[in-house]
């Protein structure tokens, strides 16, 4: 049975929502075990609450060592100036031991993201994230244009061939749209299908 981990960091809940729909898509594939976890928050709880960070997320916190237990990992992060969030970077910077062992070589890696604005760095966040995954020897999976949501021109929407994305709005008030969640589910399903093939 293939094992898929959806691992995310979310400040205000947008990436959390996307992660839940990524996991839903992955769970639609028979014979795949899906786990949803998050990376640790690095901001002290009182300070996090003061700036509106959603600290009551249900997903358990992952450990670095457990990454080796999965056949595929789908990473989710908000964008920080065109890069992944510091919390995710801090977590990944602790994976040197896994790298030394080649523990992630040949496993699937995929990324989804959130930005505050329409041109807020979604694609650079995902493609710069890929650098870390490639150093680990992971096999990168994105979202092909077979996913019809990528060519939706009827609304402002996230979604890239590199991975699912959402637009939070400058004040965080915009929630992931139906189209964005469809793309997220597609990505989760695609990764799970490929992981199942690789694990068989």
Swiss-Prot record:
Positions bound to NAD(+): 12
Annotated GO MF terms: flavin adenine dinucleotide binding; FMN binding; NAD binding; NADH:ubiquinone reductase (non-electrogenic) activity; NADP binding; NADPH dehydrogenase (quinone) activity
Cofactor field: FMN
One Pfam family in the UniProt entry: FMN_red
PROSITE patterns: FLAVODOXIN_LIKE
Binding-site list for substrate: 99
A GO-annotated cellular component: membrane
EC number(s) per entry: 1.6.5.2
The family this protein is said to belong to: Belongs to the WrbA family.
Residue ranges annotated for the Flavodoxin-like domain, each copy included: 4-191
Reactions performed catalytically: a quinone + NADH + H(+) = a quinol + NAD(+); a quinone + NADPH + H(+) = a quinol + NADP(+)
Bound cofactor: record note: Binds 1 FMN per monomer.
Keywords per UniProt: Flavoprotein, FMN, NAD, NADP, Nucleotide-binding, Oxidoreductase
Broad EC category: oxidoreductase
Protein's UniProt name: NAD(P)H dehydrogenase (quinone)
Record: residues binding FMN: 10-15, 79-81, 114-120, 135
Residue runs in coiled coils: none
